[in-house]
Amino acid sequence: MITHRSNNVQYEVTPPSVEEDLGPQFEFYWTRQKDPHSIRRKLILAKHPEVAKLCGPEWRTKYIASAVVLLQLSIAYALKNTPVLSFKFLALAYVVGATANQNCFLCIHELSHNLAFRKPLHNKLFAIWVNLPIGVPYSASFQPYHQLHHKFLGDEVLDTDLPTPLEATVLSSLLGKAFFATFQIFFYALRPMMVTSIDMTFIHLLNVLVCLVSDFILIKFGSANSLWYLILSSFFAGSLHPTAGHFIAEHYLLDPPKHYTQFQDVPPLETYSYYGMLNLFTWNVGYHNEHHDFPFIAWSKLPLLRTIAHDFYQPLPKHTSWVRVIVDFIFDENVLMYNRVKRETAKDKSVDSKTTKTQS
């Protein structure tokens, strides 16, 4: 009972049970604990030292990626006289184009880890070639930002995969999440530049120049519709498309804990894998715990890594459908833009010029 001190009226108040679900938490899941990947990597190598032999480039990558690039450029040329808003044009852009461009996005992801060639420069140059069907320059900037994501997972400043506080505040409603899921490609393209700066290099300039020349040639010998096909393919690949589910599935908490004390509780699992058939089109990016544990193992050997270290990966929660991930993300009221594990940037944690220059 509580008695109001001015009118002596008594109120009966029942405090919530410790076990009661208090609803969604409108705050990130802050922790000071180290991310689990480096810890698990050491444990796996200690128990399964043969895993180290899986590291290194995959020779087939360049041939598969080149076939996808040529497929997209061929379709773009073939659609030069097809109206952009026609069913044929939009259906091809969504079904074939988005799947192919998602493949290009994720091949560039492989190349950012130098997993197609032994020399970093060769991977960077090949990434510019794989970038052509995307329609806008992308590959040169992706690599340094993605390396920061791996090295500083969850860092409030250096991990630009994290939504900003403004995004989390504005977009955590049903409509906000639907907007984010529909236009997430723009968030992933623009957010890094607004959060963390990197040095511009000759590779960036070459990426822009080659992409512009490619677009010009495509318009000259095809038409503007040809370029629109590539742009729409890229948009659909980062929108409400089955393969786009990986963007959300990788690190968002879709089953958040009912209670969490910031900086005190053990953080929930912050990386999730998916082992379904869409990995066939996406360079096995669904093997995401495996990838973060061993970022220098190529896509083709991640299933073998999981088999060897089955005792480590089998107990981990996983997704069974990227489409289900998108649906749950939008419609589950307990899933917010805040549902990410986040870490403070330590004062002595900095990115020197060598980190950005050698990786950009």
From Swiss-Prot:
Pathway: Lipid metabolism; sphingolipid metabolism. The lineage of its organism: Eukaryota, Fungi, Dikarya, Ascomycota, Saccharomycotina. This is Sphingolipid delta(4)-desaturase. It is an enzyme of class 1 (oxidoreductase). Delta(4)-fatty-acid desaturase which introduces a double bond at the 4-position in the long-chain base (LCB) of ceramides. Required for the formation of the monounsaturated sphingoid base (E)-sphing-4-enine during glucosylceramide (GluCer) biosynthesis. One of its GO terms (biological process) is ceramide biosynthetic process. CDD domains: Delta4-sphingolipid-FADS-like. InterPro entries: DES1/DES2, FA_desaturase_dom, Sphingolipid_d4-desaturase_N. Keywords: Lipid metabolism, Membrane, Oxidoreductase, Sphingolipid metabolism, Transmembrane, Transmembrane helix. It catalyses: an N-acylsphinganine + 2 Fe(II)-[cytochrome b5] + O2 + 2 H(+) = an N-acylsphing-4-enine + 2 Fe(III)-[cytochrome b5] + 2 H2O. It comes from the Eukaryota. A motif (Histidine box-1) lies at residues 109-113. The chain crosses the membrane at residues 67-87, 89-109, 125-145, 170-190, 202-222, 228-248. It holds the Pfam family Lipid_DES. A motif (Histidine box-2) lies at residues 146-150. It comes from Komagataella phaffii (strain GS115 / ATCC 20864).
